[in-house]
């Protein structure tokens, strides 16, 4: 059990989870690596005057999913529960939006909630891109055993644009949606999310 910054009710919350009064449904907002030395920021930590981001755009889970998957103990978005869930995905693009209706069923023995997460991957392009980028998420209602709920995951296609700071694409200081394929992954953490859709951007666009 990982309980961070619980505040004055943190102890009560932990007790409720440990005794089974509530079913845990929290998710990691960071990556837990094998060792502190696995984080690229470690060697630059402690300067009182400057912060050095050696990892550049690959901050947090973006670094591990792109360059060091084998160094991850618990991936971004991971979380345990006293129950189990199954889900089905119906993805589509309408106009300038991606939408997925995710039907989640509690197939375990305890009442609980689940968080559905959507990530994207830009295949190719002139700009550097992480292997995974969180773009949307949603949470079910509290589900009794064998009960289902549909979570609507939605985001604008332009949310997958990247910032071109030096004009690599010919569009300096702009958010650019490069032409090419964008794979969209849906799941319950960054590592287990499965590819559910491939979006084709036919022309580079400034967003």
Model-derived segments and spans:
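Secreted, periplasmic, or luminal enzymes acting at the cell surface/secretory milieu
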Residues: 1-113, 121, 172-189, 193-207
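Surface-exposed turn/loop modules enriched in turn-prone residues
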Residues: 113-117, 123-129
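Intrinsically disordered, low-complexity Pro/Gly/Ser/Thr-rich segments with frequent PxxP/GP/PP motifs
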Residues: 126-170
């Amino acid at each position: 059990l990982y309980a961070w910054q619980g505040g004055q009710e943190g102890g009560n919350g932990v007790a409720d989870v440990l005794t089974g009064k509530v079913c845990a449904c929290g998710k990691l907002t960071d990556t837990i690596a094998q060792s502190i030395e696995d984080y690229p920021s470690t060697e630059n930590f402690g300067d009182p005057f400057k912060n050095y981001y050696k990892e550049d755009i690959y901050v947090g889970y973006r670094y591990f999913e792109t360059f060091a998957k084998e160094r991850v103990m618990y991936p971004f978005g991971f979380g345990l529960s006293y129950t189990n869930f199954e889900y089905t995905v119906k993805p589509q693009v309408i106009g300038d939006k991606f939408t997925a209706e995710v039907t989640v069923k509690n197939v375990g023995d305890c009442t609980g909630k689940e968080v559905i997460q959507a990530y994207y991957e830009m295949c190719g392009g002139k700009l550097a891109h992480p292997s995974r980028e969180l773009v949307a998420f949603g949470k079910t209602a509290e589900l009794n055993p064998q009960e289902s709920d549909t979570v609507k995951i939605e985001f604008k296609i332009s949310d997958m644009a990247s910032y071109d700071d030096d004009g690599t694409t010919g569009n300096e200081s702009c958010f650019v949606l490069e032409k090419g394929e964008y794979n969209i992954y849906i799941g319950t953490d960054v590592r287990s999310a499965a590819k559910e859709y491939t979006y084709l951007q036919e022309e580079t666009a400034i967003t």
